[in-house]
Amino acid sequence: MSAQLINGKEVSQKRLQAVAEAVAQRQQNNLHTPCLAVVLVGGDPASAVYVRNKKTSCQKCGIKSLSYELPESTSQEELLALVDRLNVDSEVDGILVQLPLPKHLDSQAVLERISPDKDVDGFHPYNVGRLAVKMPLMRPCTPKGVMTLLEAYGIDPKGKKAVVVGASNIVGRPQALELLLARATVTVCHSATENLADEVAGADILVVGVGIPNFVKGEWIKPGAVVIDVGINRLDDGSLCGDVEFETAKERAAMITPVPGGVGPMTIATLMENTLHAASLHDA
């Protein structure tokens, strides 16, 4: 029996509609329109597509967007100076620096320069730390989007065994914190994990984000598990696939996210929610 598909596109549209309604309500209440500043350095085609998608979502939600497209040759000092200006700009509620940055730039230093209350990606150590101590302020977009999907499909992590494959600062680590917050029993697997297949086989909820096509084999999946595939990989033939071997996994899982159309749309919807939240922080 094939797994039920978790439709991130459908859930994200509902979330975007809710943001649009909240923005319209703010305007009726004479509160300022939320504003997102997006910074793109260099000409990476995939990054340009992501930035364009974010601007389109802003338009759908009634959120103002400012775009800063900088040349590949931009120095660390120039980029930090722009972040400093945006930090003190009262019109700007959220700042997003599109990753990856060119190799000569220090991404971590740039992310740490963003004011935590404008860090709508949720990458600043302050925001990750608040999540770790159960006091979230700005929650990282992809992990929060995953939790929204679980909620939308009536999946309560409480008491479940959750396994996160991948320990990146962007997905794996904050995802584990989100699942802990939801009272799951959480295991994090990484490059030094032994017997990965055995760890995966014990998961009631499996979240995979390693950036390697078909890394998790379908036969590893516990029958009846919920599988959330965060990976998005472009193959040589131009098609997209996730980090989980989808065709075999869907014959064992109860629910599974497709790639594309699963987690990806939720990341952008959460970014819009975080920008709205940032605006509310700046109302006072």
Curated annotation (Swiss-Prot):
Q: What is its EC number?
A: 1.5.1.5, 3.5.4.9
InterPro entries referenced in this protein's UniProt entry, alphabetically: Aminoacid_DH-like_N_sf, NAD(P)-bd_dom_sf, THF_DH/CycHdrlase, THF_DH/CycHdrlase_cat_dom, THF_DH/CycHdrlase_CS, THF_DH/CycHdrlase_NAD-bd_dom
Q: Which GO terms describe its biological process?
A: L-histidine biosynthetic process; methionine biosynthetic process; purine nucleotide biosynthetic process; tetrahydrofolate interconversion
- Residues noted as binding NADP(+) in the record, renumbered to the chain: 166-168, 191, 232
Q: What is an example of a GO molecular function annotated in this UniProt entry?
A: methenyltetrahydrofolate cyclohydrolase activity
- GO CC, alphabetical: cytosol
Is Cell inner membrane given among the entry's keywords? no
Q: How does it assemble?
A: Homodimer.
HAMAP family according to UniProt? THF_DHG_CYH (MF_01576)
Which protein are we looking at? Bifunctional protein FolD
What's the source species for this entry?
Neisseria meningitidis serogroup C / serotype 2a (strain ATCC 700532 / DSM 15464 / FAM18)
